[in-house]
Amino acid sequence: MSKPQAPRRVGEKEALAVATTVRGSSYKLNLVAGLIRGKKAGEALNILSFSKKAMAKDVRKVLASAIANAENNHNLDVDALIVKEASVGKSIVMKRFATRARGRSTQIIKPFSRIRVVVREQEEAE
């Protein structure tokens, strides 16, 4: 007896990819994610490949994973995919301490973020 299949978290013609612990602030990641929202998937990959932002590499990996999920798991046409959603949120925070003068210490915050990319197959306009 197999496990019951989990319900889909996205629509019928959509595919999803998530990265839960990406090292970097959500503000910087959101600047990069804003570049690809609403774009065609191939165009978005090109934008991220040639971006000078350091966070573009992480967003590109998640987008490539979403495209691969669409092709392999949901049998969607890769050439007709558009980026429906590219959202960024906060994840865990790693806290470290640095020593300071006079025997004191200060806290260093190292933020992590999560990226969620949804691609959708665009219907051809007739």
Swiss-Prot record:
GO terms for biological process: translation. Transmembrane segments: none annotated. Coiled coil: none annotated. GO terms for cellular component: cytosolic large ribosomal subunit. Keywords: Ribonucleoprotein, Ribosomal protein, RNA-binding, rRNA-binding. One of its GO terms (molecular function) is structural constituent of ribosome. The keyword NAD does not apply. InterPro entries: Ribosomal_uL22 (IPR001063), Ribosomal_uL22_bac/chlpt-type (IPR005727), Ribosomal_uL22_bac/org-type (IPR047867), Ribosomal_uL22_sf (IPR036394). It comes from the Bacteria. Pfam families: Ribosomal_L22 (PF00237). Belongs to the universal ribosomal protein uL22 family. This protein binds specifically to 23S rRNA; its binding is stimulated by other ribosomal proteins, e.g. L4, L17, and L20. It is important during the early stages of 50S assembly. It makes multiple contacts with different domains of the 23S rRNA in the assembled 50S subunit and ribosome. The globular domain of the protein is located near the polypeptide exit tunnel on the outside of the subunit, while an extended beta-hairpin is found that lines the wall of the exit tunnel in the center of the 70S ribosome. Part of the 50S ribosomal subunit. This is Large ribosomal subunit protein uL22. It comes from Zymomonas mobilis subsp. mobilis (strain ATCC 31821 / ZM4 / CP4). The lineage of its organism: Bacteria, Pseudomonadati, Pseudomonadota, Alphaproteobacteria, Sphingomonadales. The gene is rplV.
